[in-house]
From Swiss-Prot:
Any one Pfam family match given in the protein's UniProt record, by short name: Ribosomal_L14
Keyword line: Ribonucleoprotein, Ribosomal protein, RNA-binding, rRNA-binding
Gene assigned in the entry: rplN
Protein name per Swiss-Prot or TrEMBL: Large ribosomal subunit protein uL14
Record's GO cellular component terms: cytosolic large ribosomal subunit
Species name: Syntrophomonas wolfei subsp. wolfei (strain DSM 2245B / Goettingen)
HAMAP family reported in the protein's UniProt record: Ribosomal_uL14
Amino acid sequence: MIQQETMLQVGDNTGAKKVLCVKVLGGSTRRYASVGDIIVASVKEASPGGVVKKGDLVKAVVVRTKKEIRRADGSYIAFSENAAVIIDDNNNPKGTRIFGPVARELREKNFMKIISLAPEVL
């Protein structure tokens, strides 16, 4: 469950390490984002020589949340950290690698490029 001012790890190789959620996209009263939702974020920590710099405003898709997600079969899945992957305007990842597992819910939201790059889909 991600809301405004939430800090997230970045799970790709764009150069950003941490981002801060500025806005949850999807309507003016939308408060929370879960796995597969798109947010607008500000880069708070970045490594030198990366694609994005500190202070950049980026679009990102949430790939892992500490808050558990209920699945249709009744099972739950939760991760040890909140993480996002930076995307472009066409919902394709800006980076060329994805680090760590991603949730299966991304497949239902048509983030196929992220699914194919991820080392593990849970």
